[in-house]
């Protein structure tokens, strides 16, 4: 008998802006499923959310493993299949989460493609935590700014023959779930956006290696595109940065940077990355919707 595998889980295990009676910050575990996106850009399927508070004195991989076991059991009681993968976006918690996942049949995927979790966390920061006793109102000390690594060139075998800027109206992206593609990862479209708003992206072309390139990129967990100076950079995983193109003309780089900045404001940060055999080929070997969110 084949055991079904459920959607990936997204996990955050971290302190919250709430002081407990002992003067220590409250820790909390949040888990939710990565939503499946239908042909209209809407999330669907069995959704699972689970939360537990954790005393600061109990923050360790043992507590986390026991909590994960509870979450798996509760998901099973709801008729939901267990996931195979856990996505975790906090680099500082990676080792602890990995230790907790060992022995539970869960694979840790260091990734910032945790859009559902980030949205839930933002909602809790606005609506839930301020109502809790001990909530620390006002500005908190900001976390240390992440150290951005120098972009690394793509391996020779993963480079396309050419690439091009692209743009699609938001309404077209709602149909991405029905497009023919070998590798694909979509994200829910934020509500309330103008259907005609342009969403910027990049198309990579290779007549002989499009499928291989798409497969390689799929393992990177692509997050967002960035124009840094005269370089086009793909951010992926937790902190990886891959150089897609360099030595862009100054005017071209400036215009592209403005377009991507406008997308963050107008299109909820949405972007896309596509891999095709050629510009005239309708099929996508790879298609990823990305979303540029502020760094946590």
Question: Where are the regions a protein language model picked out?
Answer:
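Secondary-structure boundary/capping micro-motif
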Residues: 1-296
